Structures are given as C-alpha cells and as structure tokens.
C-alpha cells in the first residue's frame, strides 16, 4: 500500500527515480518477517540496491550497508531533526515486535553481523539460481508482446523444481507489470495444476494462464475482465 501511494505520486510528478532510506536494520527485520511467513530463498535474500518497480519508476536504496543509528546521528547533526513515525512503536505491527525479539536474540549471540552474513550467503545462492532461471527463460519462453508470453511445456521435464518455481514467478510478474509476484503457495499450486493433463484456464497475479496445444500462454488480465471475474464470484 505504501509503495503504491508513493509510486502513484512519482508517476504523476514524472519522477523516474525513488530513493529510499532502507538500512541494514530494515534488511534484518525484512528477513525475519519473511522467515515467519515461510518464504523461500528469494524472499530471504537481501533487499536489492536497485530495482525496477515498473516501466516508469526505479527504486534506489543507497543505505543498505548503513546502521540505523549512524543514519540518525548524521541526520541530527546535519539537519538538526528527523521525522519519527509513531507506528514504529505500535506493537500491533510485526516489524515492531521483531525489533523487541532481536534484543533477546543478541543475548544468545545472534547479533547483527551474523544475521547479515546469513542474508548475504542466501543472496549469493539466490544469484546462482537466478543465473539458471534466466537461462530457462531464454530457452523455454517467448514473449509475443510485452504482456503475452508463450512457454514450452518441456520446462517441466528439463528443469529442476526450484528453477521452474522462479521461472513462473518471474514470468507472471513481467507479464502483469507488477513489482511483487504472487504468493509462493499460489505459484506452487499453479505449477502443480499445469503439470496435470486436465488444466484448462486460470488467473493469477493479474495474468490469465491457459494451455495451447503443447504450450502454455500467459497474458495480462485486462482490468475490465478482472472486474467481471470478481463480480461473478
């Protein structure tokens, strides 16, 4: 929701680059939030310093290697003040509760350095898988247009389960033009159904997924069609 509001503002003002103040502590909190949600390797890897939010906006995070306390010190010394978000103290938010849990974790030796090392190791493994995922996209996917992709069913017999999962997550995100891919569980369920011979048609993550002979067609779901589908439900 927050990114959606900010990105809409940027698009209305023709702003092409959004710089955020995400720091090392944010990375750690993000790691634990996704760990609690049962995220896979991609979710547990570190935040990206540069990401493409959509076709018109890029997000840049230059402070990922800085501690929050250092950024606060710099801000207070140069600008004499900083904006404090009251929600950062509200324990109804998981992120706030995780900050409190971390104090106990540090007593057991799970300090910032060790957590960051773990995140970096996971990120390195994720980059390796992304290399093979990109090769799979080049081999098995053909983009008919910006919002339409044809996939060869041979991917199910020629690639590993993790590569297939990352492949479909990326394709769905690319075709729909959305920043976040669908939830892992939904992508896994889609792959399971696609492997069955009785798959006909489905929608997921703003995309329509259907079979065409020995191929899978993924196309962007038009807004009017999406509204009609919701009304039918």
Tell me the role of every PLM-derived stretch.
Residues 2, 24, 94, 160, ...:
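Hydrophobic (often cysteine-bearing) scaffold residues that line and stabilize catalytic clefts
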Residues 12-21, 29-118, 152:
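Catalytic subdomain that performs nucleotidyl-dependent activation
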Residues 27, 114, 163-167:
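Residue-level detector of well-ordered alpha-helical segments, enriched
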Residues 1-7, 41:
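ATP-dependent adenylate-handling ligase core
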Residues 51-56, 100, 108, 119-233:
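AMP-forming adenylation/ATP pyrophosphatase catalytic core
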Residues 6, 71-75, 168:
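Structural element of the ATP-grasp superfamily
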Residues 7, 113, 228-232:
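Short, charged, solvent-exposed linker or helix-capping segments at domain edges/interfaces
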């Amino acid at each position: 929701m927050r990114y959606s509001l900010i990105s809409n503002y940027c698009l209305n003002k023709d702003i092409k680059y959004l710089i955020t103040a995400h720091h090392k502590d944010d990375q750690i909190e993000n790691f634990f939030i996704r760990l609690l949600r049962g995220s896979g390797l991609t979710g547990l890897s570190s935040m990206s310093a540069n990401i493409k939010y959509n076709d018109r906006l890029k997000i840049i995070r230059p402070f990922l290697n800085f501690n929050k306390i250092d950024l606060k010190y710099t801000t207070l010394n140069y600008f004499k003040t900083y904006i404090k978000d009251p929600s950062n103290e509200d324990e109804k938010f998981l992120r706030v509760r995780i900050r409190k849990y971390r104090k106990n974790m540090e007593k057991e030796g799970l300090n910032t350095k060790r957590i960051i090392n773990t995140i970096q190791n996971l990120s390195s493994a994720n980059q390796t898988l992304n290399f093979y995922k990109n090769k799979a996209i080049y081999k098995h996917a053909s983009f008919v247009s910006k919002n339409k992709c044809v996939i060869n069913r041979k991917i199910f017999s020629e690639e590993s389960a993790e590569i297939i999962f990352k492949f479909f997550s990326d394709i769905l995100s690319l075709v729909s033009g959305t920043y976040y891919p669908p939830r892992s569980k939904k992508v896994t369920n889609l792959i399971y159904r696609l492997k069955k011979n009785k798959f006909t048609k489905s929608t997921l993550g703003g995309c329509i997924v259907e079979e065409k002979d020995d191929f899978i067609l993924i196309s962007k779901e038009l807004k009017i069609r999406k509204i009609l589908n919701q009304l039918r439900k």
